[in-house]
């Protein structure tokens, strides 16, 4: 019966994602068999099960976690994790970091998935090893092997007991990040180009898998992403076409005035939709930025990825960056 449950789960995924395979990225069968998240999510050293989930789940809600941490199901005699790590969707390898000391993600791989209606990235971090044959640009099927689970990191050491896969699904802010970062004169070297974590924004992988399992992604990933709760709508006056619109056309509404864009954000900073301004303010000038609407509940969290402050009851942006490319 357990094997049948796992098969039915994959069949639901395949139908929900327009024929694309979607698989669990580790050897664990717990999610596919309907078990509670505590059976497959790895907590931090705090022991709190929710600390391995996505969102404001750490430090009493003040620290954001941009993925889920999946625990191992097998270990060697030394207690090190042995689980294989696999591509969640069919796609291509976009970035490989084999040097653990270069990132708090440790050894990690980023994949892109151009076969989907939204070219999301997936990220697989803290690996003990990456398949030696894996190359940037290589294609992998769903369940294609990436490496082995581990606890590699350049920052705080991860104990054996907390070995896990840090897994993300998300979007890239812009294609010009590498050049922008170089111009900022940061002290830290950017080893990862456009795949630097500053340029990637994940959404909740577990909620996405649950939605796929229940058949709620029949319209593809674009419908799912646009259905995420909106925290803030920011209006940017510009005649340029943002990179996001070029990269994710299914998340854009290009009907409207060519004087700017209304950008719909989730509370954690995911730009879920860009749309041409329908009702521009008279006298608005290029480069002006304003908040069109906001959800008080969504922006009242302790941990917000959006750079906003509150003046009385009205929020305002303290910084705004929009990546654009020459037409």
Q: Residue ranges of each PLM-predicted region?
A:
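Positively charged n-region of N-terminal signal peptides that target proteins for export
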Residues: 1-4
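Bacterial N-terminal signal peptides
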Residues: 7-14
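Surface-exposed, glycine-biased beta-strand/turn segments
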Residues: 19-107, 191-321
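A mature extracytoplasmic/lumenal domain signature
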Residues: 72-74, 98, 113-115, 126-128, ...
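Zn2+-dependent peptidoglycan hydrolase active-site motif and core
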Residues: 80-82, 88-131, 160, 164-166
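Short, well-ordered loop/turn sites that connect or cap secondary structure elements
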Residues: 88, 134, 139-140
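Conserved, short, structured surface segments that act as functional micro-motifs
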Residues: 103, 108-111, 138-215
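Conserved small/polar residues in nucleotide/adenosyl-binding loops
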Residues: 323-327
């Amino acid at each position: 019966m357990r094997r049948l449950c796992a098969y039915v789960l994959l069949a639901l995924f395949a139908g929900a994602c327009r024929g694309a395979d979607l698989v669990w990225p580790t050897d664990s069968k717990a999610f596919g068999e309907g078990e509670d998240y505590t059976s497959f999510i790895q907590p931090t050293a705090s022991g709190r099960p929710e600390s391995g989930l996505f969102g404001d789940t750490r430090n009493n809600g003040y620290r954001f976690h941009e993925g889920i941490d999946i625990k191992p199901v097998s270990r060697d005699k030394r207690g090190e994790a042995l689980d294989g790590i696999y591509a969640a969707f069919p796609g291509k390898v976009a970035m490989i970091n084999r040097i653990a000391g270069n990132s708090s993600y440790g050894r990690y791989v980023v994949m892109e998935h151009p076969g989907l209606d939204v070219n999301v990235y997936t990220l697989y971090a803290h690996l003990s090893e990456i398949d030696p044959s894996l190359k940037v640009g290589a294609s992998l099927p769903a369940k294609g092997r990436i490496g082995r689970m581990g606890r590699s990191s350049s920052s705080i050491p991860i104990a054996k007991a907390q070995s896990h896969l840090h897994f993300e699904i998300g979007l890239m802010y812009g294609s010009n990040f590498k050049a922008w970062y170089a111009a900022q004169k940061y002290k830290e070297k950017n080893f990862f180009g456009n795949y630097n974590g500053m340029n990637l924004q994940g959404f909740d992988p577990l909620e996405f898998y649950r939605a796929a399992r229940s058949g709620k992604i029949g319209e593809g990933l674009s419908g799912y992403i646009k259905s995420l709760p909106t925290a803030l709508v920011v209006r940017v006056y510009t005649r340029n076409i943002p990179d996001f619109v070029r990269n994710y056309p299914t998340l854009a509404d290009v009907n409207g005035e060519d004087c700017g864009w209304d950008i719909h954000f989730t509370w954690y900073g995911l730009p879920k939709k860009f749309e041409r301004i329908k009702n521009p303010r008279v006298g608005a000038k290029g480069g002006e930025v304003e908040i069109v609407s906001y959800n008080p509940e969504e922006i009242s969290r302790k941990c917000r990825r959006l750079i906003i402050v509150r003046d009385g009851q009205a929020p305002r942006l303290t910084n705004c960056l929009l990546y654009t490319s020459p037409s």
